[in-house]
């Protein structure tokens, strides 16, 4: 078996793919240690929600060169671990591992200066063991007129139908307890998700094309371990 030429070919294809993503603007391999184990201390510019969503309890650990994110029993919101990522078109890549079948990982793109939507939500790709969901939040469920109406129990059937058109759910089979890789690419009004080098699907909607994406928030509903996070800006 001629293994080395095959490995060289795979490496070349990987490099070519990364070059096509654009300029690398952020990366993290989590090869560092925390100074304590009481509060979140992810470092490298990461910000977490635990101070307000989990009464300050720790929800992020750096373990053996990875970032382990887990929700605290007292939490009132999914764990939110965010980092600046300013772009119009770009790609986020990372390795991830689910620990239980119910685990989910959401890549939530946001512009906190945008006041027409709740908490700056623009669009998101959510990965679960059985499905991947692509969503336009800016013109969908997080648009304040919809968000406030739903919260008040006054969302009309017509508006509920509109919101449904802003979400695409795609069946997937992502194993638990094993490492996987993911890519989420945004080009114009289209978001594409891939797992382990295979395209899961794409979704096009106006809110995805928002031209002032500022932050990428990683939201975890239960437990997820991450490594090799990279953000690329194409435009």
Where does each model-flagged region fall?
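Hydrophobic h-region of N-terminal signal peptides that target proteins for export
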Residues: 8-17
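Extracellular carbohydrate-recognition regions
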Residues: 18-47
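Short tryptophan-centered beta-strand motifs in secreted/extracellular beta-sheet-rich domains
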Residues: 30, 94, 178-186, 191-193
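Short carbohydrate-recognition loop motifs
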Residues: 56-76
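Secretory/extracellular carbohydrate-interaction modules
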Residues: 70-152
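Beta-strand-rich interaction surfaces with strong enrichment in secreted/lumenal proteins
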Residues: 78-85, 168-174, 216
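Short, aromatic/His-centered strand-loop micro-motif at the edge of beta-sheets
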Residues: 142-181
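Short, solvent-exposed beta-strand-to-loop segments that form ligand-recognition rims
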Residues: 196-215
